[in-house]
Amino acid sequence: MALTFELDPAFDRSVRDGVVALWTDVSNAGGAVGFVPPVTADDIRPELVKHLVAIAEGRTRLLVGYNEDGAVAATAFLALNSHRLMTHWLWLYTVMVHPRHQGRGYGRDLMAAAADAARGIDGIEAVRLTCRGGTGADRFYAACGYKEVGRVPDAIRVAEGDDRDDIIMLLPLG
């Protein structure tokens, strides 16, 4: 069964708790979404608050994918650029599909929904994201149409002696 996507959902308790639970589960499954396992919901909440502040200020939009039970199963944050010379593209952050839903094509569905959401924002011509090297995420994003446009070697320190490249990818929307 396919996910149902909603851009800018009402951020009630169920969405908040669903996003925190999703982020915690993805992180603990090894997902490269800003943390290294193990993490708890208490570790995640301050990062979510940062996104919520940006949403309240109109700088970020939240895309949520709901499963057939109406639970949060996927998310992505679309962050607008404030620099006057870069307002024609946006950032895609914290792209997540719950581990129990992986392998069903939901990641591609999420990426397509994010691209559609970006196309619906006036003046947006491209989507940019970064991903952690060594995870295979760059191959996934390439399969979704993104092109690698840059790489910063050893920019992400996962652990002492385990530095990963920060891979910059771009999806032109034209």
Task: Give the predicted meaning of each segment.
Residues 5-94, 98-100, 111-113, 117, ...:
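Acetyl-CoA-dependent GNAT
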Residues 60, 164-168:
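Short hydrophobic/aromatic beta-strand or adjacent loop that forms the aromatic wall/cage
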Residues 98-100, 104, 133:
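Active-site acidic-Proline motif in GNAT/NAT acetyltransferases
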Residues 108:
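Residues forming the Rossmann-fold NAD(P)(H) cofactor-binding site
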Residues 111, 118-131:
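Conserved GNAT acetyl-CoA-binding A-motif
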Residues 128-131, 142, 147-165:
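Conserved catalytic-core motifs of GNAT/GCN5-like acyltransferases
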Residues 137:
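Helix-turn-helix
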